[in-house]
A protein has these predicted regions:
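Glycine-rich phosphate-binding loops of nucleotide-dependent enzymes
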Residues: 2-191
């Protein structure tokens, strides 16, 4: 492969998924390029969420293949997809509302000195991610006290703090007012 022929980040070939007698996906083939925003548009029940779940290892396809960065990939758990940097954000946010922004950003990625969490280094890492993507939030603020748009930012920052290579959003603007939805689209364009 030459430099001009780099592999797509994620390719799905002939992917099908059924639930009983209902075909959620039938022979779907798509390629997603790195550094791009791709949108799947369709009616309710068209299979968009199912496709996202297959990409993230939440569901396994009945037939077809996934290729990640030029190599065949089969995810039987979300953890396997996550190890490769595939992260999902659904319309139902998965935040810990009774914990701080910092706790939500750093869960599982805390900086440690021996068996102890280095709170200063953990805070510094979270601040770096917020600064890098120009999403300023008070790291001490309880997530449950934030407006929905800021909670969505925390969810995005958490994905970015996990070194995400590909982020799959499932209806990211469903819970947002129109002005908040426009702000979210600007954030996504700037990633």
């Amino acid at each position: 492969m030459t430099q001009e022929q780099t592999p797509h980040e994620l390719t799905l070939s002939g992917v099908s998924k059924t639930y009983g007698s209902i075909a959620a996906l039938s022979d779907v083939s798509l390629a997603f390029e790195g550094g791009q925003i791709h949108a799947l548009v369709g009616e309710n029940g068209a299979g968009k969420s199912t496709l996202g779940k297959i990409m993230l290892g939440v569901e396994t396809p009945d037939t077809g293949a996934l290729t990640w960065q030029g190599k065949e990939a089969r995810f039987s758990t979300p953890a396997q997809a996550n190890k490769l940097g595939l992260v999902g954000i659904s319309q139902e946010l998965s935040l810990m509302l009774d914990r701080s922004v910092l706790d939500n950003l750093s869960i599982g990625r805390e900086k440690c000195i021996g068996p102890f969490v280095d709170h200063g280094a953990t805070l510094k890492q979270a601040q770096q991610v917020m600064d890098q993507y120009e999403m300023k939030l008070d790291p001490r603020m309880m997530v449950g006290a934030l407006p929905v748009a800021d909670q969505q930012r925390v969810e995005i920052l958490r994905a970015l703090n996990q070194d995400a290579n590909l982020i799959v959003f499932d209806e990211p603007t469903a819970r947002l007012e129109s002005t908040e939805a426009r702000k979210l689209m600007l954030i996504l364009r700037n990633l």
